[in-house]
């Protein structure tokens, strides 16, 4: 019999620490973010935002990486949260502002379309459920009137 645990991230029942890769990434992200914020607080520094936030259509919720020195000097603060975003930033700088804006707006438009489709499907199912309940209650009330009129004859 396998032992069951609760996922550290979402609390669902699982056979390991995390229920899946998504929860594992989310938990590691959260821990890293909290450790960085503690270091900023320790040195009385204002948390710096990743420089990727300066590019149109890109954002990052992770504070810039911060490294403590061996001696009690001020820590080294990077412009980015990690190497992946530093590389992405460099590649995005090669593109024009208009190109980035167009790409961002196209993504946003696609997200809004999908969101709209989901909302419309939900509304349609609610309307159909109401129509069905109204139709069945109408049939019940009509059925009662017919039976009472028949018994009077």
Curated annotation (Swiss-Prot):
Q: Which GO terms describe its biological process?
A: symbiont-mediated suppression of host autophagy; symbiont-mediated suppression of host RNAi-mediated antiviral immune response
Effect ascribed to mutating residue 9 to S: Complete loss of C1 zinc-binding activity
Ranges for region C-2: 60-85
Q: How the protein is affected by changing residue 33 to Q?
A: Complete loss of BM zinc-binding activity
Region annotation (Interaction with replication protein alpha-A) ranges: 86-127
- Molecular-function annotations in GO: metal ion binding
Which compartments is it annotated to reside in?
A: Host chloroplast envelope; Host endoplasmic reticulum; Host cell junction, Host plasmodesma
Q: Region entry C-1: which residue ranges?
A: 1-23
- Stretches the record annotates as Interaction with TGB1: 1-85
Q: Where is this region: Basic motif (BM)?
A: 19-47
- GO CC annotation: what is one? host cell plasmodesma
Claim: Repeat is one of the keywords in the record: no
* Effect ascribed to mutating residue 23 to S: Complete loss of C1 zinc-binding activity
Please describe the post-translational modifications of this protein: Phosphorylated at Ser-96 by a host PKA-like kinase; the phosphorylation at this site seems to suppress host cell death.
| This protein's UniProt keywords | Coiled coil, Host cell junction, Host endoplasmic reticulum, Host-virus interaction, Inhibition of host autophagy by virus, Inhibition of host innate immune response by virus, Metal-binding, Phosphoprotein, Suppressor of RNA silencing, Viral immunoevasion, Virulence, Zinc
Coiled coil ranges? 92-132
Q: Which domain of life is it from?
A: Viruses
Phosphoserine-modified residues are 96
Asked if Zinc is a keyword of the record, the answer is: yes
Subunit description:
Homooligomer. Interacts (via C-terminus) with replication protein alpha-A. Interacts (via N-terminus) with the movement protein TGB1; this interaction targets gammab-TGB1 at the periphery of chloroplasts and plasmodesmata. Interacts with host autophagy protein ATG7; this interaction disrupts the host ATG7-ATG8 interaction to promote viral infection. Interacts (via BM region) with host STY46; this interaction inhibits the viral infection.
Q: What does the record's miscellaneous section state?
A: The genome of this virus consists of three linear, positive, single-stranded RNAs encapsidated in separate virions designated RNA-alpha, RNA-beta and RNA-gamma. Three proteins (alpha-A, beta-A and gamma-A) are translated directly from these genomic RNAs and the remaining proteins encoded on RNA-beta (beta-B, beta-C and beta-D) and RNA-gamma (gamma-B) are expressed via three subgenomic messenger RNAs.
Q: What does this gene product do?
A: Suppressor of RNA-mediated gene silencing, also known as post-transcriptional gene silencing (PTGS), a mechanism of plant viral defense that limits the accumulation of viral RNAs. Promotes viral cell-to-cell long distance movement by enhancing the ATPase activity of TGB1. Enhances RNA helicase activity of replication protein alpha-A. Suppresses autophagy induced by the host as a defense mechanism against viral infection.
Q: What does the record's free text say on domains?
A: The three domains C1, BM and C2 are involved in zinc-binding. Zinc-binding of each of the motifs is critical for the biological activity. The coiled coil domain is probably involved in homooligomerization.
The family assignment reads:
Belongs to the virgaviridae suppressor of RNA silencing family.
Protein name, as recorded:
Suppressor of RNA silencing
């Amino acid at each position: 019999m396998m032992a069951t645990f609760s996922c550290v991230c979402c609390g669902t029942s699982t056979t390991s620490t995390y229920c899946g890769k998504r929860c594992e990434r989310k938990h590691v992200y959260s821990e890293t973010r909290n450790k960085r914020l503690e270091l900023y607080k320790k040195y009385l520094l204002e948390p710096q935002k990743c420089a990727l936030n300066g590019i149109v259509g890109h954002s990052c919720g992770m504070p810039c990486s911060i490294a403590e020195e061996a001696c009690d000097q001020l820590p080294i603060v990077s412009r980015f949260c990690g190497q992946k975003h530093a590389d992405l930033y460099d590649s995005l700088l090669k593109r024009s502002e208009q190109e980035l804006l167009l790409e961002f707006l196209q993504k946003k438009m696609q997200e809004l379309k999908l969101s709209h489709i989901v909302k419309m499907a939900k509304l349609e199912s609610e309307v159909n459920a109401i129509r069905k309940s109204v139709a069945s209650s109408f049939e019940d009330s009509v059925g009662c009137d017919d039976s009472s009129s028949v018994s009077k004859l």
